[in-house]
Amino acid sequence: KYLLERSNTVIQVEQMIASKSPQFFDKSPFITRPTLSVLKRLFHESEVNQFLEKNDGCVGFEFIDRVLDHFNFSYQVSQVDRRNIPASGRMMIIANHPLGALDGLALLRLIGEIRPDVKIVANDLLMGFDGLKSLVLPVDNLGGKTGRQQLKAIMNCLHNEEAVIIFPAGEVSRMSPSGIKDQQWNQYYLKIAQKTNSPLLPVHIGGRNS
């Protein structure tokens, strides 16, 4: 039986699966138990929860700083590029997504240094992290569905003259014969930009995992 409750500072893989694929638990325990064990290791459930407990109470940009520091993750931006980031007014930042969650957090932190009214469109599973809730506009990437309320939340931020970060590929870049590249970008961000009359700020994220 999967766990239904979650404290403010821990994640539970069972609950994450239950929210996305409840039919998984209709299968035989001989299938679900070893699968859950593997998924917990893949998600580093124990290590993540140790980090969350250690940093309980940290939210927003402070939480991001703790995450980046934990992974010894740094980024560099030229002064010219930094000056291209408007300090106010509605704006959509569109970027490639080569490194997974860390590049999204780093981009959030960068924009937040210039203007704190920034949010990122990201997988709704991140809402399980209390430290990120105030900065995330959740969408269902795994289910391939973006609901009307989710789109409305994105557009409301732009109408409120805030900045919104979007990864149009909707997923992390993949290896291809010509290198690591995003999948085809979804054009929905153009429709949002047109409807809200929002300028676009393209960002290219380069880097590597070490």
Predicted regions mapped to residue ranges:
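A structural signal for short, well-ordered beta-strand segments and their strand-loop junctions
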Residues: K119-A122, I165-F167, L200-H204
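Gly/Ser/Thr-rich loops at beta-strand to alpha-helix junctions
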Residues: H97-A101, V172-S173
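Conserved nucleotide-cofactor-binding alpha/beta core module
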Residues: G112, K119-H159
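Short, flexible loop segments at the rims of nucleotide/cofactor-binding pockets, characterized by
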Residues: E53, L68-F73, H97, D140-K145, ...
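Membrane-anchoring hydrophobic helices of lipid-metabolizing enzymes
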Residues: Y2-I94, G104-A106, E113-R115, K133-S134
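Catalytic-site beta-strand/loop segments enriched in glycine and acidic/polar residues
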Residues: M91, C157-L190
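"Short basic amphipathic alpha-helical interaction patches in structured regions
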Residues: L105-I111, K152, I180
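A cross-family acyltransferase "interaction/gating" segment
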Residues: P177-S210
